[in-house]
Amino acid sequence: MWFKNLQVHRFSAPWSLSADEVEASLAKHAFFPGTSLEMQTQGWASPRDNGQLVHTVGGQMLLTLRTEKKLLPTTVVNQVTRARAAEIEEQQGYKPGRKQMKELKEQVTEELLPRAFSIRRDTRVWIDPDNGWLAIDAAATAKADEVRGMLFKALDPLPLINLHVNQSPVAAMTEWLAGDAAPGGFTVDQEIELQSGAESKATVRYVRHPLDPEDLRRHIAAGKRCTRLAMTWNDRVSFVLTDGLVVKKVAPLDVIKEQADGTAHDEDERFDADFTMMAGELSGMLGDLTEALGGERKA
């Protein structure tokens, strides 16, 4: 159940909401399947499909935002609209105008929507009240923005801010590579992206490739900066840090898997054990990563 991505946030004031209070607030914006004429619906769903919108273990909270979207390709709508427009032109003797075409397209969309397939996407949120972390499991900023918007809507007021650090990820990652020295507790892995600041945006990528410090220094001397860097924290968690301070490709390593609680009797107990371990490890990793980036900068 480990998160694969971390869009990291902090609280500008101590977290004060209980799980029951969060549950009650989310319930006002709970997910319900859309009608046949709705293109998209969105709301909070149970992370464990047990009716509870907040899953809590040891004070750690897990939320799930569910999005249901109809798959209605624009090409299909345009194709049917053009066919209808041709019929209208034949009947009235001239092509439909812009306003008529717009109305026709809306009519076609309404007719096709009930027959469109629906897909659901769940985006998870982890809240660590004690250490002040909130992370969204989303690789794309746009998806994280959706979640943030729904959080602010449900938990108003919510003292949520982006994590700010004293040294930019680009400057720090470039410095680590130039000096061939990762910060304490971290190692550099075999995935790197270096990008030029020039208009050409010339880019060099290493993927599962041995790193030559001299080659890296030459690229850096030529003006390229590190925008993506794979790292491992304490031989326990691997990840990729991006220039936007998004943590991607998060994965527990074997040492954590070996420490997993083998006494769990059922799926629910295993899930809770995994969630507890994930929260503990990622909280420690985020704290160390923040320090490696010069510490937290208060907004």
Swiss-Prot record:
<comment type="similarity">
    <text>Belongs to the RdgC family.</text>
</comment>
<dbReference type="GO" id="GO:0006310">
    <property type="term" value="P:DNA recombination"/>
</dbReference>
<dbReference type="GO" id="GO:0000018">
    <property type="term" value="P:regulation of DNA recombination"/>
</dbReference>
<comment type="function">
    <text>May be involved in recombination.</text>
</comment>
<dbReference type="Pfam" id="PF04381">
    <property type="entry name" value="RdgC"/>
</dbReference>
<dbReference type="InterPro" id="IPR007476">
    <property type="entry name" value="RdgC"/>
</dbReference>
<dbReference type="GO" id="GO:0005737">
    <property type="term" value="C:cytoplasm"/>
</dbReference>
<protein>
    <recommendedName>
        <fullName>Recombination-associated protein RdgC</fullName>
    </recommendedName>
</protein>
<keyword id="KW-0233">DNA recombination</keyword>
<dbReference type="GO" id="GO:0003690">
    <property type="term" value="F:double-stranded DNA binding"/>
</dbReference>
<keyword id="KW-0963">Cytoplasm</keyword>
<dbReference type="GO" id="GO:0043590">
    <property type="term" value="C:bacterial nucleoid"/>
</dbReference>
